[in-house]
Curated annotation (Swiss-Prot):
The keyword ATP-binding applies. It is found in: Cytoplasm. It holds the Pfam family RecA_C. GO terms for cellular component: cytosol. It comes from Corynebacterium diphtheriae (strain ATCC 700971 / NCTC 13129 / Biotype gravis). HAMAP family: RecA. This is Protein RecA. One of its GO terms (biological process) is DNA recombination. ATP binds at G77, P78, E79, S80, S81, G82, K83, T84. One of its GO terms (molecular function) is ATP-dependent DNA damage sensor activity. Keywords: ATP-binding, Cytoplasm, DNA damage, DNA recombination, DNA repair, DNA-binding, Nucleotide-binding, SOS response. InterPro entries: AAA+_ATPase, DNA_recomb/repair_RecA, DNA_recomb/repair_RecA_CS, P-loop_NTPase, RecA-like_C, RecA-like_N, RecA_ATP-bd, RecA_C_sf. It comes from the Bacteria.
Length: 372
C-alpha cells in the first residue's frame, strides 16, 4: 500500500515568510487594485470628520462634534419626541457647509414649511416619496454611490413597506420581509457610504414585544441588522413640556447615545425644542457654558467675561440669538474645554503630558548636605 501524501501546506520559515507575504500582497494588488490590503500604520488617516447636529449639547454627546461622515446613524424614540427635527437640523448644517442633502420621505409626512423654519434650504433639498421599501432603499443606494451626497435621511424604517406586502391582501402574513430587506440594503450601502463619506440617518419607531416580564419591552422595527450596522444609535425622548404661563411653547428633550463606535457611548444631551422654531442652540450653549464655568451664574443673572448677559435664561437665550457672533465664541470655548471636534488633538497632547514618566517620579530630596 502506497504511503499517503501529506496534503498539509508547508509553513515558510525565516525570510521565506516575508517573501511569501510580499508575493501574496503583490498578487492581491494586481487582481484587486492598490490599497486592497494595507498595513494600518502605513496610511495617515485623518480624524473622523462629522456633520454638526446644529446643537452644542448633541455635538458634545456624540463626542466628535456631530454625526460621523461615512457611517450609518439610527435615531429612534416614541412618537413626537423630536426624531425628525434632529435629522432636519443635521441637514440644515450640512447645507450651510456647502453640502448636498437628500430626504427619503417614506412616511409621506415631510412638512416643507417646518423644515424651512429649521434652516433647511428646501429649494436645494432632494426629496423622494417612494411607493415601496425596495424603491426607497434603491434610490438611497444610487444617491450614495453618486458620491455627491453629504447626508441622506430615511424617514422612517417602519414605513419601508416591502412590495409584496403592498401588493398583497390586508390580512396576508409577511413575516420577516422587512428585516430581510433592511439586511440586504445595509450590506450593499455600508461600503458605499464609507467610500463616499456620506452620512446616512435612519429614523426608526418603537414597538413593544409581547410577553416580556423582565427588562424593557421596547424594540425598534426592521429587524436587528440596523442595530449592528449603525455606528451611532440615539434614543430621543421628550421629558418635559416647556410653558409660558399656561401655554405650551416647547419640549425639554433628552438624547442618549446608546451606541457609539467613534467615541465613548452612553453620553446624554438635554436640549429644548421650541414649537415652530426647532432645537434651541442658545439654550444648550447657556447650560453647557454654566456647567463648564465659561458663563457665570449668580442668582438669576448670567455673566460672561465680566459682562452681564441678562437676567433669566429666556432673556439670555434671546440675547444670544440676536448676537450669533457671541454665541459662536462661547460655543467654541465649550468645545475647547471638552476637547470636541477640532480640539480633540488637544486632549491627546494633554494625555501625553500626563503620561510623561518624569511626572511619575516621586518627590525625593537629593540635597547631600548634612542636617547637623
Amino acid at each position: 500500500m502506497a504511503p499517503r501524501k501529506n496534503s498539509k501546506t508547508q509553513q515558510p520559515t525565516g525570510d521565506n515568510r516575508k517573501k511569501a507575504l510580499d508575493a501574496a500582497l503583490a498578487m492581491i494588488e494586481k487582481d484587486f487594485g492598490k490599497g486592497a490590503v494595507m498595513r494600518l500604520g502605513d496610511e495617515n488617516r485623518p480624524p473622523i470628520s462629522a456633520i454638526s447636529s446644529g446643537n452644542t449639547a448633541i455635538d458634545v454627546a456624540l463626542g466628535i462634534g456631530g454625526f460621523p461622515r461615512g457611517r450609518i446613524v439610527e435615531v429612534y424614540g416614541p412618537e413626537s419626541s423630536g426624531k425628525t427635527t434632529v435629522a432636519l437640523h443635521a441637514i440644515a448644517q450640512a447645507q450651510k457647509a456647502g453640502g448636498i442633502a437628500a430626504f427619503i420621505d417614506a412616511e409621506h409626512a415631510l412638512d416643507p414649511d417646518y423644515a424651512r423654519k429649521l434652516g433647511v434650504d428646501t429649494d436645494a433639498l432632494l426629496v423622494s416619496q417612494p411607493d415601496t421599501g425596495e424603491q426607497a432603499l434603491e434610490i438611497a443606494d444610487m444617491l450614495v454611490r453618486s458620491g455627491a451626497i453629504d447626508i441622506i435621511v430615511i424617514d422612517s424604517v417602519a414605513a419601508l413597506t416591502p412590495k409584496a406586502e403592498i401588493e398583497g391582501e390586508m390580512g396576508d402574513s409577511h413575516v420577516g420581509l422587512q428585516a430581510r430587506l433592511m439586511s440586504q440594503a445595509l450590506r450593499k450601502m455600508t461600503g458605499a457610504l464609507y467610500n463616499s463619506g456620506t452620512t446616512a440617518i435612519f429614523i426608526n419607531q418603537l414597538r413593544e414585544k409581547i410577553g416580556v416580564m423582565f427588562g424593557s419591552p421596547e424594540t425598534t422595527t426592521g429587524g436587528k441588522a440596523l442595530k449592528f450596522y449603525a455606528s451611532v444609535r440615539c434614543d430621543v425622548r421628550r421629558i418635559q413640556t416647556l410653558k409660558d404661563g399656561q401655554d405650551a411653547i416647547g419640549n425639554r428633550t433628552r438624547l442618549k447615545v446608546v451606541k457609539n463606535k467613534v467615541s465613548p457611548p452612553f453620553k446624554i444631551a438635554e436640549f429644548d425644542i421650541m414649537y415652530g422654531e426647532g432645537i434651541s442652540r442658545e439654550s444648550s450653549i447657556i447650560d453647557l457654558g454654566v456647567d463648564n464655568g465659561i458663563i457665570k451664574k449668580s442668582g438669576s443673572w448670567f455673566t460672561y467675561e465680566g459682562d452681564q448677559l441678562g437676567q433669566g435664561k429666556e432673556k439670555v437665550r434671546l440675547y444670544l440669538k440676536e448676537t450669533p457672533e457671541l454665541a459662536d465664541e462661547i460655543e467654541d470655548k465649550i468645545f475647547r474645554a471638552l476637547h470636541i471636534g477640532k480640539y480633540a488633538a488637544l486632549k491627546d497632547a494633554d494625555d501625553a503630558l500626563t503620561d510623561d514618566p518624569v511626572d511619575m517620579v516621586p518627590n525625593v530630596d537629593f540635597d547631600d548636605s548634612d542636617d547637623d
